[in-house]
Amino acid sequence: MSLPFDGAISKFHTDAAPQDVRDAIAEDPKGPILTDYPYDDRMKRSDYEDQLAALQIELVKLQAHVKATGTRIAVVFEGRDAAGKGGTIKRFRENLNPRVARVVALSKPSDKEASQWYFQRYIAHLPAGGEIALFDRSWYNRGVVEHVFGFCTPEQRAHFFTQVPEFEQMIVDEGITLVKLWLNVGRAEQLRRFLERERDPLKQWKLSWIDVEGLNRWDAYTAAIDETLSTSHSATAPWTVVRSDDKRRARLAAIRAVLAQVDYAGKDHAVVATPDPAICGGPEIWNA
């Protein structure tokens, strides 16, 4: 089976990736690459599975509370490409009722949507009473990817930054619990994951030309992310950053971060606990 995009990711790896990135991948091609991570080794599978099972029971309790009380929860999943957003969302909802917990993953705007107020197409997908909406990417496309690739003007982006605090304030004032998660991953581990996807026929669908083109724009992404997080972090709608080089630890931290936002009957505080502060915190840890 041929490689997607004519093997462009492999070509970047061999011809254009920084030497330290290539060295890290050569040293640990199966990963995860944890060179700058707070832990030297991936979390043991048995420990991960035990904690995940207990946390998924807590998510079921949360779902029952949401349905019974009409609570509305919106969780925004953002992050670097290949940071594990989709896998984390999967672990959130795999034991939940899809009528209660639904994923919102919008494609690029249509011509009609592009002519509307920027936030308009997202409003229709906010949760109704008794729903949890999981946004696999969100309105923050304008702050990062649209800026990096020139899909919006500087004026449009500046207008977005002016409006996003007010938009999120309205969401919260309406009674919706808003949780914003930023999943981050190091450059070597990101490229290793891309190479893995490129070679695996079952994962190739995850790749896009944005992923390929973005490989050469790491620094531009870094600057855009830094500005976006610092500008849109607020007491009303704070960012929770999860360092996701170890997917197992990251998934557990993300689930705990959401469960911490809602009180529900039968909550097991020993299980929910506090997200691991070594990998989960505010914007100050995003590029640590």
Where does each model-flagged region fall?
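Glycine-rich phosphate-binding loop of ATP-dependent small-molecule kinases
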Residues: 1-288
